[in-house]
Amino acid sequence: MAVVGNAVPCGARPGGARDNGSPQPGSRLRPGLAAGPALIANGDELVAAVWPYRRLALLRRLTVLPFAGLLYPAWLGAAASGCWGWGSSWTQIPEAALLALATICLAHALTVLSGHWSVHAHCALTCTPEYDPNKVTFVKVVPTPNNGSTELVALHRDKGEDGLEVLSFEFQKIKYSYDALEKKQFLPVAFPVGNAFSYYQSNRGFQEDSEIRAAEKKFGSNKAEMVVPDFSELFKERATAPFFVFQVFCVGLWCLDEYWYYSVFTLSMLVAFEASLVQQQMRNMSEIRKMGNKPHMIQVYRSRKWRPVASDDIVPGDIVSIGRSPQENLVPCDVLLLRGRCIVDEAMLTGESVPQMKEPIEDLSPDRVLDLQADARLHVIFGGTKVVQHIPPQKATSGLKPVDNGCVAFVLRTGFNTSQGRLLRTILFGVKRVTANNLETFIFILFLLVFAIAAAAYVWVEGTKDPSRNRYKLFLECTLILTSVVPPELPIELSLAVNTSLIALAKLYMYCTEPFRIPFAGKVEVCCFDKTGTLTSDSLVVRGVAGLRDGKEVTPVSSIPIETHRALASCHSLMQLDDGTLVGDPLEKAMLTAVDWTLTKDEKVFPRSIKTQGLKIHQRFHFASALKRMSVLASYEKLGSTDLCYIAAVKGAPETLHSMFSQCPPDYHHIHTEISREGARVLALGYKELGHLTHQQAREIKREALECSLKFVGFIVVSCPLKADSKAVIREIQNASHRVVMITGDNPLTACHVAQELHFIDKAHTLILHPPSEKGQPCEWRSIDSSIVLPLTLGSPKALALEHALCLTGDGLAHLQAVDPQQLLCLIPHVQVFARVAPKQKEFVITSLKELGYVTLMCGDGTNDVGALKHADVGVALLANAPERVVERRRRPRDSPVLSNSGPRVSRSTKQKSALLSPEEPPASHRDRLSQVLRDLEEESTPIVKLGDASIAAPFTSKLSSIQCICHVIKQGRCTLVTTLQMFKILALNALILAYSQSVLYLEGVKFSDFQATLQGLLLAGCFLFISRSKPLKTLSRERPLPNIFNLYTILTVMLQFSVHFLSLVYLYREAQARSPEKQEQFVDLYKEFEPSLVNSTVYIMAMAMQMATFAINYKGPPFMESLPENKPLVWSLAVSLLAIIGLLLGSSPDFNSQFGLVDIPVEFKLVIGQVLALDFCLALLADRVLQFFLGTPKLRVPS
């Protein structure tokens, strides 16, 4: 058997694997073993590299061997030999021995835990690279970027059909098998998706049971469901996370330091919080699990007859019957339609509200090879979709006919390999979720750790000067100081801010699947928009037909000639459902409505407003993106005769059809270009009389015979009006210091016109990049009116963008990608319109902007945008219609509208359009309506996005089609970001004050009682809770928030405020000491029972006052969130804290003071404390505001 080769990531740059921290197996292999190429096929969509490993025996693992075999025995040996200078008792452990043991235990714990935190570390610690296929037990699978995280998976061994052993593994529900004979690589299971049409047309399914068993073994079952882990498994995963482990460690230290109440209170809070997150995770997983198809019986042609088979037992290669199901069952897998026609509702999969027509391949050329990219839209029915109507195969023709009168289809893919399965995998394993425990948080903690180490070192050095002091207790205190820089409540506080925004967005009909992306919305620099259906409306308006008269004059539809009528009435893919509903492309519906013809179920069209014969559609050659045209064969009865006269009708892109016309107007190109510049959509129409044809000729006629020698019958001109609020929203986004970019598949001239209308473009000329017409020629920038022509090489993109607006087409992008990718990367940030781009190119634009360091937002709808939405920092998917459940819940007799708390209102009926509140409405009615809406919303829990809810791969989904949601997301993002940053400032100040209190003051005998620590913790928790409840302001400000913690303003304000607090604390401490009895002993007894004293009471009151001051001073307020007086809960929380401080200072309740271990303070000293507190507050506030004025306003980095 062939040997598993050395695994090197394919396509990675040298050292690429080291970038992600994976251990590199040695390049030199054992003698006698052949070194094969990379273990994964180059260009695999999911897997980048595979590394083979063998699990080590328990005692040989690095998590056990160095510790059990070396470090612990060495420590015990040193203790036994008296190296540590051991006393007579085990209680008198020398500090060196204690430090050594603690260090070994900590290193051991971290080593074990690092295996939980990192797959690469786990492999290095517990496995060894192995190249002998007989010994390999696991493989480490590294996915391609943005496709989940690295996993260590078991390697399975099965017997193949030829009796040889086959190695395979499963990664993210996809099976990979090792090809030992040819490629020496792991390959995904090959599904029958690239054969010639003759293979499918002549296929008769599985004839023998042995073939079925072999297929089941190769492809697995047709199940796309996930197993929901139990509570304990998920909780264990969270309980071993770095933050949680650290927090539990801190709680343990506090318990050792006799802070029992505080420790138990904090630990309970942590466990409850993590448990609630696990419950929420389990609920979400259960919802996702329900999205998979439910098994049902389906007719399958096996062993030469039709028989009912459970849908989860279907395998690729089966012939199945597909049709409309009375139980509304979904299509169980991806199938190729062989015979019969279907109308399919794909909304459950793509969010596309328009049902799609699917055509069979029975009459297509047998030599043509199935291309899923090109053929899927027309011939493949995807799993998870619903057949709303089907036309069974004609009885007169030969071939298979299902017993249930369904359509005949060939099974292509099953399980998680289907389109629906891929979407489910995206939800389960896709882009790594953004969490609170990010790199910035850790760097921030390391910054604070510097001060903590200095404080701990001071305690150790000063504390060890007293020979009688317990070194164990001193070591414990030093450890506590080091841990104090990471507040245990940090993740909770970050989550609180995010959850507040989550609830606010839910009330605005927005659903978020990745809540920790919300702060990224506050950092957004570039906002990218799709055009069709996002910026422009779906309600299309047919302006008329151009090119029939002189120049670009548009003829009204009522005055067009009969040939144009026939071309428009017949050349479409529309279908009528059983209930009379017309389904198909909105553009084609608008055209048929404009000419006022009626379509019937049997493919006939009849005029309503003009007197002429009806048409019967015989053959459709559907629109394809590559061909940019559609043609049909139709017929009408001659007057006074039953003879049929056949016609050809063609419509498509004007530049494509030009060569097909026998003659056309001399200003043909000028007309369609000029109209496109005005923002209209233009399609050329062709017509041809074919005369009499036999039935066989009509059935066998080729597309080429229709698409030649055509008569030009006009340009159909369709306007796509902008959505009512697009202009206002884009203006608001631009005024808020964002760069806006359009990324669309539409015509560049139309796209540029819309961009100009929306003020994306404010330059006099827009240059479009034209790739060379011949090889070797340079690319050219050409203005829309062709008055400016510049070579691409002339000047830098930045200089060019200062004078002109730039538009890049899909062709231009593809050319630069192939010729000069570096120049393309420099150009992308300066382009304002990307037109005629394919879905993959949209994704490329977004990932390129991210690579260049820009925080990007993508807003779009439909399947074309899924990749871009998934990879953007903030992806917002718009739904064309609000979900029915929301609509039905809100129907009232008056059908009153819903008011969002940002101004615009949205109708409860899907038929009503978005509008602004009329200024005449009384404020009271506004308030009543708002309160009613909020009551309605509170009745529902936050919904889980279902597969029908559009681009489920997007982190944000808006249930309304207005782009107003982008403003809501940015407002909430900025508010959350500012809240998060101010929390970090507050935590930093509190941590620094605590480090000083626990070091210098601790050695002077100042410490807090358990009750004091608990009261302080409760008051602090109240302030943190309400500071996270801040709401954004109604309008976006031009000022941008600081994007991260590490900036000059944050560092300086923290250091200056700390200096003010530090000096105040030192001054009051010394004043209190001067008023206290002199110390008799040289060294303070740090371990005696807590005793109230003037010094302790002064420091405690000062510490509480400073903590409350940090909240009041560092609360940001306008322009990103409501001001402090408007945040009533926080004001009340600060007021309660202030009253508590004043009460404790004045001693208004002696019993209360006594309970919390405070002594009576002399009156004159109370005045001193009060004055110092006031001065401390004023100086810290002044320092922050001055720094804010000079350093606190960042500028937009992107070229504008």
UniProtKB/Swiss-Prot annotation:
GO biological processes: extraction of mislocalized protein from ER membrane; protein transport
Pfam families: 2TM_P5A-ATPase, E1-E2_ATPase, Hydrolase
Modified residues (Phosphoserine): 896, 902
SUPFAM superfamilies: Calcium ATPase, transduction domain A, Calcium ATPase, transmembrane domain M, HAD-like, Metal cation-transporting ATPase, ATP-binding domain N
Active-site residue list: 530 (4-aspartylphosphate intermediate)
Region (Disordered): 886-928
Sequence segments annotated as region (Arm-like): 883-945
Cytoplasmic side: 1-63, 114-240, 462-985, 1029-1047, 1114-1128, 1184-1200
GO molecular function: ATP binding; ATP hydrolysis activity; membrane protein dislocase activity; metal ion binding; P-type transmembrane transporter activity
Transmembrane segments: 64-84, 93-113, 241-261, 441-461, 986-1006, 1008-1028, 1048-1068, 1093-1113, 1129-1149, 1163-1183
Annotated spans, A-domain: 196-227, 292-432
Region (N-domain): 540-721
Domain of life where this protein originates: Eukaryota
Catalytic class of the enzyme: translocase
Residue numbers binding ATP: 530-532, 623, 681, 746, 861-865
Region annotation P-domain: where it falls in the sequence: 509-538, 724-882, 946-961
UniProt entry keywords in alphabetical sequence: ATP-binding, Endoplasmic reticulum, Glycoprotein, Magnesium, Membrane, Metal-binding, Nucleotide-binding, Phosphoprotein, Protein transport, Translocase, Transmembrane, Transmembrane helix, Transport
Residue spans, topological domain Extracellular: 85-92, 262-440, 1007, 1069-1092, 1150-1162
Positions annotated with a glycan in the UniProt record: 284, 417
Family stated for the protein in its record: Belongs to the cation transport ATPase (P-type) (TC 3.A.3) family. Type V subfamily.
Domain notes: Contains a large substrate-binding pocket that recognizes alpha-helical transmembranes, which alternately faces the endoplasmic reticulum lumen and cytosol, while remaining accessible to the lipid bilayer through a lateral opening. The translocase alternates between two conformations: inward-open (E1) and outward-open (E2) states. Undergoes a series of conformational changes with ATP-binding, phosphorylation of the Asp active site and subsequent dephosphorylation in a Post-Albers cycle (i.e., E1 -> E1-ATP -> E1P-ADP -> E1P -> E2P -> E2-Pi -> E1).
Function: Endoplasmic reticulum translocase required to remove mitochondrial transmembrane proteins mistargeted to the endoplasmic reticulum. Acts as a dislocase that mediates the ATP-dependent extraction of mislocalized mitochondrial transmembrane proteins from the endoplasmic reticulum membrane. Specifically binds mitochondrial tail-anchored transmembrane proteins: has an atypically large substrate-binding pocket that recognizes and binds moderately hydrophobic transmembranes with short hydrophilic lumenal domains.
Name of the featured protein: Endoplasmic reticulum transmembrane helix translocase
Source organism (scientific name): Mus musculus (Mouse)
Underlying gene: Atp13a1
